[in-house]
């Protein structure tokens, strides 16, 4: 009993004489450490002055890290397309790479004014498509995208004229991508071994 009492008394004395070691580690919560490390990467923010857009003084951090890369946004003035003043962030990060879109004017193909984003990101790489004029093969005006991305690499195909072997005008794509690497096959002439004129492809890819 005497040894136990002496040990406990010695520990209490150590804590009183060295308060900067164990006492400070117990008093610092984990949440404050995380917020301090997070704010160290940001410029100094005056809590009483104007704050950057999306910054919450209660949490001590930004609502969205994407706002750190954007210029300062005037909440009372015009906002970039797809920006929500309530959440303080964009509906879609893909809009950051697009030019400003006038919601009342003509919009790029496949852009939805309700969702504030494109139906398909593949449309961003395509030139502007006139919905009332001729459309590229395989393009659906209802979905605002291509039925098959493989058609983007092919030259424009005339649906009323001769089509490449294996191309289906109904599906707007090839029955087999392996035919793209083969020379044009004359269906009425001699065919390579293993080629089926009905399926428009080889029975076995090993023949290629």
Swiss-Prot record:
Biased composition (Basic and acidic residues): 27-44
Signal peptide interval: 1-23
GO biological process, one term: vasodilation
A cellular component term, taken from the record's GO annotations: extracellular region
Compartments, record wording: Secreted
Alphabetically ordered keywords of this record: Amphibian defense peptide, G-protein coupled receptor impairing toxin, Repeat, Secreted, Signal, Toxin, Vasoactive, Vasodilator
Role: In vitro, produces constriction of guinea pig ileum smooth muscle. May target bradykinin receptors (BDKRB).
Protein name per UniProt: Kininogen-1b
Organism annotation: Bombina maxima (Giant fire-bellied toad)
Organism taxonomic ancestry: Eukaryota, Metazoa, Chordata, Craniata, Vertebrata
